[in-house]
Amino acid sequence: MSQAELLSPSPVAPSFPPLSYQGVPVLTTEMLAQAYEVEQHQIRQNFKNNRERFTEGKHFFQISGNDLREFKNCVENFYSVQFGKRTPSLTLWTERGAARHAKMLNSDRAWDVFELLEETFFRVVRSDP
């Protein structure tokens, strides 16, 4: 059984596919960067420079191997999201991880977007199978 789940679409952030991992709504690094209007490398650099402030399973999930393969297959079958074929791992950000990034970016845009994500994307209701 895959740990990836599809959720019902967010009414305010329809451009982001509603993704879930281990029952937790998540965003990819690309999605988070797009929302905050920064480059992906800025998200990665903030994470690298503040790694001790992030806890895996609480702020993010780092998936690889079979988990990554299952997640990619599930997402790519339902959405136009594409992942690199040779991507060895993928970081998925939880609501708490997205909040940490908003704090580090410390821009009005980041805080406004986080509030929107908090009220919509991270509050989606699971679809019944």
Residue ranges of each PLM-predicted region?
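An anion-engaging/catalytic patch
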Residues: 1-129
